[in-house]
């Protein structure tokens, strides 16, 4: 696998940064994967890490000194990072390995007293700064936040995005921006706040019924929102909101202001007033100039948007049928393409091209919801692998093809993973596949108390794998937006997350269910559906929830070891396939329908 940037370009980038560090009397430079909104997915302007290191993964932290450059990534990216950093001067630092200290500890241990660490305060969260200062300050190390040294060294840095912001009609949103603002203001008053700052892009888009295209795959736009008790201000780049939309917003007492004025406006808030903001989603550059009192808590909109309304869920169910129909047509094509691959070569890139074309035929299709993961055999062992023109595999011979894909529609966001056997699967592959399927079914069938901390559900999914002394490094579930980000919170199904009040499972939340098992250098398996919390009933012990499975697409049964499935697990699988067939058959014809009918026949041992 080749790197996304050449070894020489990475070396040139590091050399330029080190020269700038020397000129600024800076001993270390910290480059987080972040922007002024602490987004998971970044606009091109903020893609500093790939330019600096050549690593193309979506998450990672870089530390550079005059004689060291390190990239910190978690286990999802170890295999990918090893390949992409090969031949560079960047060391791979594995988060979670005892021999590799966290980047904060590394800085504290390696830098001398009196050293200075530079990091762009516009992209550093308050919580991250506090963690850094707790380790660096006692050792006499200074943190400098007003320098963007990597950005100054990037000669062809892309501009900030200028695409127009779009209005999301209430017929799709389900509630007006006035109603949503009223809910947020109620929460502000409950916490004694006259003002509330929102910097998270999906919160801003949800709250104001707006969408954009500033970040690949995520229908959001660069913005901050400052909410008062009677009006609100939307800070965006010039030209992004046209006159007609500006007038619509003004009807809701939302007024458009220049993007770069937000810090100044915040600094001018009355000292006697109180500002509510989320310290985990707000940067130092915005908060350091405040004079007002503050309340630090999660954005109320984060809770509100996670609990989808009945209106939104009805749209999502329709979108799942559309997406499922496109997927059936795709898998019917794939089956034929694999059969003919000796004559017409098939590769990982062709998977994404065909999926995109078929989804684009569906009403309301907007875009992919993330870069498609099409990974054959060893590539599947990298959970976040992406095929590129420079590096992709041919699909031929025997093996497992993992396809993780999703789409944005006007009425919802999809995310699904299926594994397709190519040729004849081996017994070890079948064993792994069956274990992952058992894990997915276990979580799908679970009933649990309303309000339980979502990380506590993780062990249920992992138990079938733990029984085999197997494990996977990523979380089992993440929240999913409503025609918004494919990753949202506050819920997360991962035992590595800290159970807290904000992770409570509530009705209407959409979460992924995606256990996996990865054999580096051999294969990867992940099976994923989206599920929604719904009431399972009440008893003397309170209300309980269960999952409604939203995703509609057959699960491959070729790799199942029937002897390893219990009767109740087989019953769940057959009931799921019956529902898939019932809802998708009316939307299909020809080869797609034939494939669906074949792939939803009852499974028997």
Model-inferred region functions:
Residues 1-605:
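Active-site neighborhoods and metal-handling regions in enzymes and metal-associated proteins
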């Amino acid at each position: 696998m080749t790197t996304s940037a050449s070894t020489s370009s990475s070396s040139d980038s590091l050399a330029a940064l080190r020269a700038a560090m020397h000129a600024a009397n800076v001993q270390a430079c910290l480059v987080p994967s972040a922007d002024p909104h602490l987004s998971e997915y970044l606009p091109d302007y903020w893609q500093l890490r790939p330019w600096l290191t050549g690593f193309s993964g979506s998450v990672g932290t870089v530390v550079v000194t005059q004689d060291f450059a390190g990239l910190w990534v978690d286990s999802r990216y170890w295999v990918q990072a090893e390949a992409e950093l090969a031949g560079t001067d960047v060391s791979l630092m594995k988060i979670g390995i005892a021999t590799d200290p966290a980047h904060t500890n590394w800085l504290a241990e390696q830098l001398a007293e009196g050293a200075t660490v530079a990091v762009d305060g516009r992209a550093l969260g308050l919580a991250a700064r506090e963690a850094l200062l707790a380790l660096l300050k006692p050792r006499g190390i200074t943190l400098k936040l007003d320098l963007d040294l990597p950005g100054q060294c990037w000669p062809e840095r892309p501009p900030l995005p200028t695409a127009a912001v779009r209005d999301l009609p209430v017929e799709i949103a389900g509630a007006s921006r006035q109603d949503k603002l009223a809910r947020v203001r109620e929460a502000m008053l409950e916490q004694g706040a006259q003002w509330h700052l929102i910097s998270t892009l999906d919160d801003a888009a949800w709250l104001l019924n707006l969408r954009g295209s500033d970040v690949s795959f995520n229908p959001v736009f660069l913005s901050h929102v400052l909410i008062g008790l009677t009006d609100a201000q939307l800070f965006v780049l010039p030209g992004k909101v046209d006159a007609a939309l500006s007038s619509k917003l003004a009807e809701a007492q939302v007024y458009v202001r220049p993007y770069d004025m937000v810090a100044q406006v915040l600094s001018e808030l009355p000292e006697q007033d109180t500002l509510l903001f989320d310290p985990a989603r707000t940067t130092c550059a915005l908060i350091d100039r405040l004079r007002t009192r503050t309340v630090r808590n999660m954005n109320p909109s984060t809770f509100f948007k996670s609990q989808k309304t009945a209106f939104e869920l009805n749209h999502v169910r329709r979108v799942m049928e559309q997406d499922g129909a496109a997927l059936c047509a795709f898998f019917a094509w794939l089956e034929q393409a694999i059969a003919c691959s000796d004559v017409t070569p098939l590769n990982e890139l062709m998977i994404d091209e065909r999926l995109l074309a078929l989804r684009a035929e569906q009403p309301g299709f907007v875009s992919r919801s993330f870069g498609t993961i099409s990974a054959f055999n060893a590539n599947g062992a990298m959970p976040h692998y992406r095929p590129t023109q420079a590096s992709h595999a041919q699909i031929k011979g025997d093996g497992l093809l993992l396809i993780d894909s999703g789409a944005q529609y006007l009425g919802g966001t999809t995310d699904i993973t299926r594994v397709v056997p190519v040729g004849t699967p081996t017994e070890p592959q079948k064993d792994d596949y069956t274990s992952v399927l058992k894990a997915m079914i276990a979580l799908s069938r679970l009933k649990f108390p309303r309000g339980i901390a979502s990380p506590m559900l993780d062990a249920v999914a992992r138990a079938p794998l733990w029984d085999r002394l197997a494990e996977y490094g990523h979380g089992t579930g993440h929240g999913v937006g409503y025609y918004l980000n494919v990753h949202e919170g506050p819920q997360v199904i991962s035992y590595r997350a800290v159970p807290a009040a904000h992770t409570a499972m509530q009705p209407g939340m959409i979460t992924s269910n995606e256990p996996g098992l990865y054999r580096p250098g051999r294969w990867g398996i992940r099976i994923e559906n989206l599920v929604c919390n719904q009431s399972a009933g009440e008893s003397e012990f309170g209300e309980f929830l269960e999952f409604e499975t939203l995703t509609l697409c057959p699960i491959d049964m070729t790799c199942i070891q029937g002897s390893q499935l219990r009767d109740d697990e087989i019953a769940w699988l057959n009931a799921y396939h019956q529902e898939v067939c019932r809802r998708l058959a009316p939307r299909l014809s020809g080869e797609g329908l034939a494939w669906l009918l074949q792939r939803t026949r009852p499974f028997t041992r």
